Amino acid sequence: RLENAKKPDALKRVIIEKLVDLYEKDGQFNEAIRFQDGLTVMLFVGVNGVGKTTSIGKLAHRYKQEGKKVMLVAADTFRAGAVAQLAEWGRRVDVPVVTGPEKSDPASVVFDGMERAIAENIDVLMIDTAGRLQNKDNLMAELEKIGRIIKRVVPDAPHETLLALDASTGQNALVQAKEFSKITPVTGIVLTKIDGTARGGVVLAIREELDIPVKLIGFGEKIDDIGPFHSENFMRGLLEGLI
């Protein structure tokens, strides 16, 4: 098809199709969040500073607007700033946030959140966690314990474990994806800070090396600037201005 692609638009279309084929491999790649009939539990992981807590806040707003009952859990208990930031998002979008005393056991805060979510017929429970990659063993133990606690209340949860990655960090994002997928099973990626400069070509590398789909994409500062990932639109964005 490339021989016929003399015009830039035709060439761009062929390349986009190729990139989408490459990304979706056998066309079998689920980019959608797996919402459940009852409670959907979403666990968010990722290093500090990649927009993880902000993404949770924006998603809370989005899901609430869709008519879902949303609750947040602040399980990054060792960073006072993280708890305060999530609590502030809760106030801003008017959804409840479950917190514990400072430096309390994250798993116990998660347990409280799970119990409350069941009691209050919540549709979507989103859990913010610590991102201390420099101490992998501790983080792994913490996330494993959180996972066990979640399963004790809802055996098939968490339904999504989403890794937040900053698109502008390039190769570093791939390294983080590798590290986190060793620590905990990751079902999808929230790609943040996609704007003019950060094209996020790293999603192709992550797809190729780790087989983890991007499920959500954050593309700006405003509260509405987050949404589902569509590979074709994304590949088109990667090529904007290049051809």
Report each predicted region and the residues it spans:
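Short glycine-rich anion-binding loops that position phosphate/pyrophosphate groups of nucleotides
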Residues: 130-132
